[in-house]
Structure formats: C-alpha cells, structure tokens
A protein has these predicted regions:
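Extracytosolic ligand-binding ectodomains
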Residues: 2-15, 20-385
Length: 385
C-alpha cells in the first residue's frame, strides 16, 4: 500500500434510491410556521431527495437511516422536549425539481435547515436559493467540490471526488500498472474520471482503455470487450451500485479474470452481482464489518429495527440528521442558530468517521478512507496485493 495512504483509508462508494413509504417519518407534512425558531412546537428539517425516478434505490437507504435517528431522538425527548420532524419533498434528484423545492422550504418559516439533495448537480442548482435565504443546505452525499463553494451556508460531511479518486488511483497504482476504466456518462462521472485520470498519470498508472457508459444500459458488453482486449490487469468502474453489478457480471461472462474495482458497498450490490461480486474492491469511508464499538453498536440497533444490515447511505443519513440536531442543541432551533453552531467549529460525533471537524471548505478535514473487498459474499477490509 502506498506510504501516503492509511491502512484504514479507502473505498469509493457513490450514490441511487427506492420508493419511500407514505407513512414514513420522512413524509410528515404537518409542520407550519409556528414551529420556527425557539417558539415551541416541532423542530422541522427539510429533505430534498429522490423518492422516485432513476435514483430511487437510495431513498430506501436514506429513509431507514433517518427513521432510526428520528425514533431514537424522539424517544429520548427530542431537543428540550421538542419533537424532531422531517419534511420530505421528492426531487427525483433532478435540478428542475430541486429549485422549486428550495423555494418552498425557504418560504416555510418552520424549516430551519435542509438535508440533500442526493446528487451534487441537484443540490448546486438550488444552492443560491438557500444561500440568499440564510438556510443551511446540508448536502451529505455531495462529493462535487464545487458544492460548498456555492456559499457559506453550503455544508457537507461528504468527502470530495478529488479526495476519493486521487487516493483510489494511488492505491491501485501500488499493485497494478495497466488498467481499463469505464465511467458514467454524467457530470459526476466525467468529473470523477478527469480527477482519476490525472492522479493515475501522476502515480504512473497506465490507462489502456477508457469509455463512458450509460447508467441505465442493460448490456455493457460491447464496451467491456474493448476494455478486456486492451490487456488490463484490472478494470475500474466509476459509477453506482446497479450499473456496477451489471458490469462485473458481464465482465465475468466475457471471460475477464482480472481485478474489478467498483460497484458499491450496499447489500443490493451483492445481491444483484451475485457470485461475480467476489473479490470486488470498493473505495469507502464506512464498512459495515468495522469492529469499532460505535459501528458495531449502530449495526446492531439498525438490524434489530429493520432486520438487515445497513448500507453506507443509511449511515450517511443517520449521521447527517444527528449532526444537524447537535447543531440545534448548540446554537438554538433557528436558521441562524444552526449556521452559527456549524461555523463555530468543534468536533462532531458520527458513525462513519468517529469524531471529525469541518475544515475551511466546510467538509470533513481529518478523516481517512478504507478499501473494502467482497470475500465469501461479505464486505471485509482489503489489503494491497
């Protein structure tokens, strides 16, 4: 493993969403302006994210993480006896939807902070609206570095594409010399690939073949055959879980036996990829099998509640809600109070990072990544080969 990369430092998960239950705690619609500021009533946070559409798979992950956090918070008395509620609006992770949702939230005095959107593009389209209104936009899955450049009310506990892709290229270069890369035909995919390509060149990692792919394609074999025939030691996929599962299955079907980097650290990726997932390496910052006490405890509470292991995105949602509620405790239940608490610094307790501080770019400044692999159908820490 490269010297500048920690043993517990790696794996690139990236975000999608399944339909949410109408009776979920996410879809409470009873909040009004009377809950604003420190006036009593419920503490209301807005959620802009996909409940339907192409990114719907991740909605279930968010829902479960939010629901667990809400149930625990409110069972413990909320904040000074005030119940915590989420007001969810379905954006389909579409910038055309996220902007009117932002306008709706800023006009609702009850909403004191916003969580989302899922994709950086959908979040960034709405940032100006939140910034002008002084409403914190907490883009907890937004890895585009430009997201937090939209204003001082844009905050994200998500690590940037530069952070992920640079370290991914460095880690891969420690064991491989020649690779093929496929990446999503999207703003996120192109940006991720540009960063990865530059980092690979600096690390001496040769990209023998590169190609964009469509996220909703069912047959990637025409591209994958070319990727295979370029003679790589590994194929790197920059994308999401559903497309990653199809890619690794089809790679094995066409006879590629080298290393696969990609997919996503979710139960659904394992299910969709089947036996082809074995040996996959993913770059992440949270591992379900992590033996830290905080992760073990979270996993148990989550599984007791939902009957299955959490995904990384459930942990992201759980942490995001708890960080914002801690900001409410520190600064008060107002838009200004949340912003002041985040701006005042200090350490924030999470499942995925342990404790961390926000850096000057309003992102985590002192965390590491962890490479994970699939072994016997289970995610475990990966070692450099």
């Amino acid at each position: 493993m490269p010297k500048n990369l920690s043993r517990r430092a790696f794996v690139g998960a990236i975000p999608a969403f399944a339909a949410l239950s109408a009776c979920s705690a996410l879809s409470r619609a009873g909040a009004t302006g009377s809950g604003s500021a420190d006036q009593g009533g419920s503490i209301v946070l807005g959620v802009s994210g996909p409940r339907t559409g192409a990114s719907a798979e991740y909605g279930q992950y968010w829902q479960e993480g939010f629901d667990l956090a809400l149930e625990e918070l409110n069972a413990a008395g909320g904040v000074d006896g005030r119940k915590v509620e989420l007001k969810w609006e379905d954006s389909q992770s579409d910038p055309k939807q996220s902007v009117p949702i932002a306008q709706k939230f800023v006009a609702d005095a009850a909403v004191i902070a916003e969580l989302g959107d899922f994709s950086s593009g959908a979040s960034m389209a709405a940032s100006a609206t939140y910034q002008q209104a002084g409403l914190v936009q907490f883009g907890f899955t937004n890895s585009n570095p430009d997201f937090t450049k939209g204003g001082d009310h844009m905050w994200s506990p998500s690590l940037t594409q530069e952070f992920y892709q640079t370290r991914a290229a460095q880690w891969i270069a420690g064991s491989y010399q020649r690779i093929s890369v496929v990446y999503l035909e999207s703003d996120w995919g192109k940006n991720s690939f540009d960063i990865f390509k530059a980092a690979a060149a600096e690390a001496g990692l040769e990209i023998a073949y590169e190609s964009p792919i469509q996220p909703d394609s069912e047959d990637y074999r025409p591209v994958l055959i070319k990727a295979r025939d370029a003679g790589p030691q590994a194929v790197v996929h920059l994308g999401y879980g559903p497309d990653g599962a199809r890619i690794v299955r089809q790679l094995r079907e066409i006879g590629f036996t080298g290393q696969f980097f990609g997919g996503q650290n979710t139960p659904q990726f394992l299910e969709a990829a089947g036996s082809a997932a074995e040996g996959t390496i993913i770059i992440e910052n949270f591992l379900i099998g992590n033996d830290s006490p905080a992760v073990v405890d979270f996993n148990k509470r989550f599984k007791d509640r939902f009957g299955h292991d959490p995904s990384t995105f459930s942990a992201y949602a759980y942490d995001a809600l708890n960080v914002l509620i801690e900001a409410v405790r520190r600064g008060g239940a107002t838009r200004e109070g949340v912003f002041k608490a985040l701006s005042d610094g200090g350490r924030w307790k999470t499942v995925q990072f342990g404790e961390f501080e926000f850096s000057a770019d309003r992102r985590p400044g002192d965390v590491t990544l962890l490479p994970v692999t699939v072994k016997n159908g289970v995610y475990v820490p990966a070692e450099a080969s």
